Regions:
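Acidic, small-polar-rich N-terminal luminal/periplasmic segments of exported/outer-membrane proteins
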Residues: 46-184, 588
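Membrane-embedded beta-barrel scaffold of Gram-negative outer-membrane proteins
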Residues: 339-368, 538, 544-550, 577-636, ...
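Outer-membrane beta-barrel domain signature, strongest for Gram-negative TonB-dependent receptors
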Residues: 258-417, 424-426, 598-600
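Structural signature of Gram-negative outer-membrane beta-barrels, strongest in the C-terminal barrel
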Residues: 281-287, 407-410, 420-424, 466-606, ...
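N-terminal Sec signal peptide and the immediately downstream disordered periplasmic leader
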Residues: 1-92, 213, 286, 290, ...
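Transmembrane beta-barrel wall of Gram-negative outer-membrane proteins
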Residues: 200-302, 398-399, 403, 408-424, ...
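Gram-negative outer-membrane beta-barrel transporters
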Residues: 417, 485-489, 605-607, 626-721, ...
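C-terminal beta-signal and adjacent terminal beta-strands/loops
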Residues: 712-722, 746-807
Length: 807
């Protein structure tokens, strides 16, 4: 505690010092700089480039918003060949990410803002019970679908709870992907293509994209974007079972032998993304704007993208890009969004209606052999079946109908306001069917007296089906009093009611009386109000001090845990529901710009109550979520960017985060300790640093040559908050820090661009999470000679070339 208190005092002092130095430096630059700004960039009267956002529902200069917000331009994403959320957020202050493979895309969020995370880093194979701590919007549709980053205007990253700005609340922050709108002015388009090769891959990666803007009249236009991206894979599956036509492992010396037949599969984690988006924009009158859009994406993945760090059953270590699982783990996902946005300008305010419907569904095959082999299931329940291949066939679905109305006043009055109403009906579905293929046939041969019994038994080991429905109704708003030309106070409130229901059907066990299905249904409503307060002071025309106190909220839910019968848990009633978790975010900061310098410095402290944790029940390991006590996250965020002379640009982002439990974590209904107070929250590095430096040269013929280097560093992270080992699955681990370096060199003419790029220049094997060998590794004693231990790693070095042609 002494250390934490010392940090807060020292951090605050340092932050104020940095802010004052930045402000003074910016003032000096404004007086001495004579560099010419590009003519196509909007500037204020004193030469400051304007970056506009719509975070508050109106178009405004990001420097005039009294909150902590970062903007990533779509052009920068294109120029640096960034197409994934993970790569983008590595360069955003306050954010940390887990390097989930493509199988987890759309199933679990990989982003944490300001340290608010207790979900184990390795989660990602199954739809979690809890919702993410960071809300995600595609334009004005709240959804987490992890779309590819193509044809994007900008990304707005807001830190801290945002429930009084948007209908969908959040705990840690909000990420908004703002797509490019159709343009009335002219017909134009572009085509992009890239080819690259990743270390340890036997093939090449490639992508092709096209964008068309088609104006039909001065107030009607259409925009189409489409493309595909193929990654050839780089993880080799070293010892996959050879299967017969029924999916049963082949026994080369007869069904009763302990021998197995395996093969290797190189570059098994290939992936393919196909996407398209169509939007139509109309302005029937000067006051009315309508935009209808449809977006879809399809993902297919050959297998998992994480290697095994450890040994096989013969004691031989796996290579750095080898996985020891006995079964391939393919997956697929389809996602769709249909949205209608309408804006009407009344003069004094703009009324916006955002109606949307999204749907996504996915499937995957998972290998559970390591889990069964290391937790006694094969010995106790399956007579040590010699070719263990427990396979999980999983599905997930998420669909919602959302309507949001927002009335936003024009700025410049004594009082400014944002008023909103929000409705969402969300349906979630998940299933898990586990098979041990070949077990009943082997058991019938091993125990001939019971052959009829085993032949009738089949190979299905476990069935789990879950249907959830969630209703969210909210009224929200902000009121700003501009009591001085340079000072203002804002207050906000979000009042809401949630209704949540969960129906689950489970049929565990191969053998009677354990294979009797039992349904469970639990409902849970909640209603409350959240508040926000903000003060901001314009220290100079382009410099602002701000401080905010805001409350965040994440809905609770219910667990399907049997209360009675063979599979009842001890203290099962304590597992039936988990409460909402809430937080109080306090921050102060200074942001501004002068000439070519931009800066944003902030310190924050977050008190997190009733923290939610995805876990398993202690006896039978049912999927569940639980509440803990309290946690605290505090830290410092720093962003600097600008130009040095006419040709150099730079950016520097730094985050310090100290996120820990402030109360011990116990198993619900018991006094079993899972984590002591003071435990570091998982996937949250203390230090995050990123930066970039670029140089532009202009040739006599007008061509531009741009060279850029970017780097990121994160310090060590923990794998799970459960460090004591009372959990069914022990995954406690700590992973060292690592650095990533990227290079690019581009030559561009009037309507074309060619880029040579290198990602992960030093081929750093950075690990951000794992399924540990202690729980998933090899176990020759039960004839499991592979390993399901896996590490979530950064993508190996990738070298490629991309081209773009505009027409």
């Amino acid at each position: 505690m002494r250390k934490m208190m010392s940090f807060k005092k020292n951090t605050l002092t340092s932050a104020i010092g940095v802010a004052l130095i930045s402000a003074y430096a910016g003032h000096a630059c404004a007086q001495s700089s004579t560099a010419t700004q590009p003519e196509n960039q909007a500037k204020t009267d004193d030469g400051v480039q304007v970056v506009t956002v719509t975070a508050q529902g109106r178009t405004e200069n990001v420097l005039k918003i009294p909150y902590n917000i970062s903007v990533v331009k779509g052009k920068d994403l294109d120029d640096n060949n960034i197409t994934s959320q993970t790569d983008m957020l590595r360069e955003v202050a306050g954010a940390s990410v887990v390097s989930h493979d493509a199988r987890a895309s759309g199933v679990v969020s990989d982003v944490t803002i300001r340290g608010l995370n207790v979900t184990p880093a390795a989660e990602g194979d199954f739809q979690l019970s809890t919702t993410p701590t960071v809300s995600v919007y595609v334009d004005n549709t709240p959804t987490f679908a992890n779309f590819i980053l193509k044809d994007i205007n900008r990304v707005e990253v807001l830190r801290g709870p945002q429930g009084t700005l948007y209908g969908s609340g959040s705990l840690g922050g909000t990420v908004r992907y703002i797509m490019n709108d159709p343009d009335f002015d002219s017909f134009y388009g572009k085509v992009d293509s890239s080819v690259s090769k990743t270390y340890n891959s036997g093939g090449t990666n490639n992508s092709e994209d096209i964008v068309l803007n088609i104006p039909f009249s001065k107030n009607l236009a259409m925009r189409l974007s489409a493309g595909k991206e193929y990654d050839s894979g780089y993880i080799d599956y070293a010892n996959v079972y050879v299967l017969d036509g029924k999916g049963t492992p082949v026994a080369p010396s007869g069904i009763l032998s302990t021998q197995e037949l395996t093969r290797s599969v190189p570059a098994a984690n290939w992936s393919k993304i196909v996407y398209d988006r169509l939007s139509v924009l109309a302005e029937p009158t000067p006051e009315l704007k309508l935009e209808l859009s449809y977006q879809r994406q399809s993902n297919n993945v050959g297998s998992g993208g994480s290697p095994t760090i450890g040994l096989n059953g013969a004691g031989v270590p796996y290579g750095p890009y080898q996985f020891g699982g006995a079964t391939l783990e393919p997956a697929g996902r389809d996602a769709y969004i249909t949205a209608l946005e309408a804006d009407y300008d009344f003069g004094f305010a703009t009324l916006s209606s955002n109606s949307s419907k999204y749907h996504q569904e996915g499937w995957s095959i998972g290998d559970n052999a390591g889990l069964y082999a290391n937790h006694g299931f094969l010995q106790a329940d399956y007579y040590s079946y010699p070719r263990p291949n427990p396979i999980a066939y999983r599905t997930s679905g998420d669909s919602a109908l959302t309507e949001e109305l927002r009335l936003v006043s024009k700025k410049g009055n004594t009082f400014d306001y944002v008023l909103g109403a929000y409705y969402q009906k969300q349906n979630l579905q998940a299933s898990d069917f586990d098979n041990i293929n070949g077990f009943s046939q082997w058991a019938a041969a091993e125990f001939p007296a019971a052959a009829a019994y085993f032949n009738a038994l089949g190979n299905n080991d476990f069935q789990y089906q879950r249907w959830q429905t969630f209703y969210d109704r909210a009224l929200y708003g902000n009121l700003t009093w501009n009591f001085e030309p340079t000072m203002r106070i804002t207050g906000g409130v979000r009042s809401f009611r949630d209704d949540f229901s969960n129906t689950t059907l489970m049929a565990p066990g191969l053998q009677p009386p354990y294979n009797i299905p039992f349904p469970l249904q639990v409902d849970q409503p909640d209603s409350r109000s959240l508040f926000m307060g903000n003060f901001s002071w314009d220290l100079a025309p382009n410099q602002m001090f701000y401080t905010t106190i805001s409350q965040g909220y994440r809905r609770g839910g219910t667990n399907a845990v049997p209360l009675t019968g063979n599979f009842a848990e001890v203290d099962a009633a304590a597992w039936q529901a988990y409460k909402p978790d809430t937080d109080v975010n306090t921050e102060l900061g200074i942001k501004g710009a002068s000439g070519d310098l931009r800066y944003n410095v902030s310190v924050f402290d977050i008190k997190w109550h009733d923290i939610q944790l995805d876990t398993q029940t202690p006896i039978w390991g049912w999927f569940a979520a639980q509440n803990g006590g309290t946690a605290d996250s505090h830290g410092l965020e720093l962003e600097l960017s600008g130009k040095a002379g006419r040709d150099w640009r730079y950016a520097l982002n730094y985050t310090y985060t100290d996120a820990r439990l402030t109360q011990a974590l116990y198993t619900p209904g018991t006094n079993l300790l899972e984590a002591p107070s003071g435990t570091q929250l998982p996937s949250v590095p203390h230090n995050n640093l990123s930066g970039s430096l670029s140089h532009v040269s202009t040739f006599d013929n007008g061509w531009n040559w741009t060279n850029r280097i970017s780097a990121s560093y994160q310090s060590s992270v923990t794998n799970t908050v459960m460090t004591v080992g009372s959990d069914v699955i022990t995954n406690a681990a700590t992973f060292g820090g690592f650095s990533l370096f990227n290079l690019s060199s581009s030559v561009s003419g009037e309507n074309w661009n060619m880029t040579l790029f290198v990602k992960n220049l030093s081929n750093q094997l950075g690990t951000t999470g794992a399924l540990t060998n202690a729980s998933y590794g090899t176990n020759p004693a039960v004839n499991f000679n592979g390993s399901d231990g896996k590490a979530m790693i950064t993508q190996p070095r990738t070298i490629g070339i991309s081209g773009r042609y505009n027409f």
